[in-house]
Amino acid sequence: MSDPFYPHGHGGAAGGEGAAAAGYSSYEVDLIAARYGGRPLANPSSAAADLDARLAGARRSMGVLYHQPIMGSHSTVEQIEALYSSNTMTKRPRLESSLPIYPQRPGEKDCAFYMMTRTCKFGGSCKFDHPQWVPEGGIPNWKEQAANVEESYPEQEGEPDCPFFMKTGKCKFGSKCKFNHPKEKVNALASGNTNDKHLIADSSILPVRPSEPLCSFYAKTGKCKFRAMCKFNHPKDIEIPSSQNEPESAVTVEGETDIGSAADSVSAKMQTPVAAAQEFNSKGLPMRPGEVDCPFYMKMGSCKFGSTCRFNHPDRLVLNFPLPLGQTILPTPESMLLNSSANFMQGFDFHAAHMPVGPGPVTYPQRPGATVCDFYMKTGFCKFADRCKFHHPIDRSAPDPSANWEPAEESVQLTLAGLPRREDAVVCAFYMKTGVCKFGMQCKFDHPPPQEAIAKVSNSGS
């Protein structure tokens, strides 16, 4: 095995007397201490010379052991022991560092780049603090600890409330924000009180916008869940109706509104009261005479809002159909009725009820002089109905005079090439250059025969 005192291995003793033991005797320990400690050996023997020869290769290792560099300086064993001593009275050696020194600014924030890399490109001009205890290479995972100090926001009376501060309680602009930051309003919202009295008492939280429409939800309940973010008007002198005065037949239709886009689409989904219908059609949908017909119901025959829909849903069944010839409705004597509750069957005809019932006739607009609606003439149907701007003749089989109109044919003399002769018109320039005309008989210019064309060219050239 290798040994730090015998880097070249153990050799035999002088004279060939056995091999040296792996451990050291007390004499060998005293010899090593005397050689490197500066003390003379009391009883030197002849074995000292042999031991010096064997320990010659260990001098470098011992030198390294007793001369370790600490932060650029060379320390002895006594200095190392003093450095790590637990005695507070021991004088410790001053450690000198070869790393660059940057400005120390106690009270300022630590230079983030210096703390992570132990370097700073600004050098002495850096305005931050550079502690000397940072090791070489810096602290890669260093993060600045945020000071636990509550930031104050400006309260500017007369200015609009900061919407982001009213919603979150924070403002990224801090003291530079030009809006008002009322702390008492934010504390009132964060307290969680949502009763009517609290909201009405704190109605100053809601924005007053005289030029905007009235917030309908605020007018009904005195509350507004969008608070300062609402873009509608919230007057403070409005009378809030109590819940006891509201009729029980009022049904509130409320659409779910996304809070992220509420400020832009509140008007489209705001809640409005709808009175309960008194009559319903055969499908159970409300009939509201005087209201606009439900467009979806008129087109598809159904309505996803059901009984809460505010539009009219007329019964699409045509009950006023003509009776077959020879049938009359006779009143039934009261003596033949089983009870008085069967009076509704008095004027009902069962034969007529089994006749096929279809939608009523649709009348399309008559616009004489306008263009005939092609789709209506082909199919007898027009999806635009009374909004169509074309003419819808009642008799589709009648010929359309405008469709059969043809321009009066002119008597035009043709040349041997089949091109028109128009002596009172200008000569066709393309025909004079190439001898042909792509428009043929439809060309409105003159096409003289070749001999006449050559004569015209020669006369014009002379």
Curated annotation (Swiss-Prot):
| InterPro entries documented for this protein | Plant_ZF_CCCH (IPR050974), Znf_CCCH (IPR000571), Znf_CCCH_sf (IPR036855)
Q: What is this protein called?
A: Zinc finger CCCH domain-containing protein 8
The record ties this protein, via PROSITE patterns, to: ZF_C3H1
For the keyword Repeat, the answer is yes
List residue spans of C3H1-type Zn fingers.
105-133, 156-184, 209-237, 288-316, 367-395, 422-450
Q: List the disulfide bonds.
A: none
Report keywords, A-Z. Answer: DNA-binding, Metal-binding, Repeat, Zinc, Zinc-finger
Please verify whether the record's keywords include Acetylation: no
Pfam families membership: zf-CCCH (PF00642)
List the Gene Ontology MF annotations in alphabetical order: DNA binding; mRNA binding; zinc ion binding
